[in-house]
Amino acid sequence: MVILLRSIPKGDDSMNLYTVSFFGHRQIDNIFVIEERLETMIRELLLSKEYVEFLIGRDGEFDQLVASTVRRCKRAIRDDNSALVLVLPYATAEYLNNEQSFHEYYDEVEVCAESAEKHFKSAHQTRNRSMVDRSNLVVFCVNHNSGGAYQTMQYAIKANANIINLSDVTR
């Protein structure tokens, strides 16, 4: 079952929906430090927000780390006020051939309507911008000035999005 990306504004005041999207490089340095920072942030969101929608892709190490950290925090803290949502740029063969497994791992799977209509080379950036536009908070793990995650961070900055770059956070 493919669910198209909803065209909704940031959050949803009627049910106090707080939307967070995540973007990072395919490979990340200091994975344990980043995981600790993610866990602290996710824990705080689960405890302080009425309902949290965690939007992620499936494009590399950072996405996998976010997904596993969200799932772990939901089990340990509470799982009744959040959804882990995989947002695909288009219906991939991997998804279509393993749909049941995807739906068992993620609370929701969406295909971004805007990016599904684009050429595959621009679909990821279109999906990323759509995710930024619907988010209350955009979390990055970007430590170099190139790549799709960096381009998305530049877009989020220009859009005046509320952003955190976990690579910049100091203790």
Regions found by a protein language model. Give the residues of each.
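Short, Lys/Arg-enriched N-terminal segments with co-localized hydrophobic residues
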Residues: M1-S14
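Acidic/glycine-enriched connector segments
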Residues: G11, M15-T170
